[in-house]
Amino acid sequence: MHERHNIVTFVKEKLEKGEQVNLVSDQVRMPTYVDDLARACIGAAEKKAKGIFNISGEKHMSYLDIGNTIAEHFSLDKSLINHVKTSELNQAAKRPLTTGFDLSKSISTLNYSPTPFTDTLNILYP
């Protein structure tokens, strides 16, 4: 069975092979732990919450920051990670530089508490 890559497996596999990885420093995301998403859905159902709730990770991180954090977690060579700008890539689809969410409603209504990215790595890859 072919497993789909995510940023963690992509960076980890490349660095383990000693391959260079190009990661953008100007695209920012909020990585989300799937268990946090599941807990938020359960919380919304239990509270019979109405409306739209944003669920994501706790803070904005560039792909470069995410890659460096992954390399540190697995004790891999960060010097193989190349810093690039979005404008240098030939991406088929335009990507927004920043995506993220205001979590205040989810935090106050659902008692949502996002797991920090480093903690997520420790849980998934002890």
Regions found by a protein language model. Give the residues of each.
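NAD(P)-dependent short-chain dehydrogenase/reductase
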Residues: 1-29, 36
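Residue-level signal for the nucleotide or nucleotide-sugar donor/cofactor binding architecture
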Residues: 2, 29-32, 61, 101, ...
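Glycine-rich Rossmann NAD(P)(H)-binding loop
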Residues: 23-28, 53-60, 109
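Conserved beta-strand termini and adjacent loop/short-helix elements that scaffold enzyme active sites
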Residues: 24-26, 83-86, 117
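Residues in well-ordered alpha-helical elements
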Residues: 35, 42, 64, 104, ...
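Mid/C-terminal beta-alpha module of Rossmann-like enzyme folds, strongest
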Residues: 40, 47-92, 98
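A hydrophobic C-terminal alpha-helical subdomain
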Residues: 87-109, 114
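Amphipathic terminal alpha-helices
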Residues: 116-126
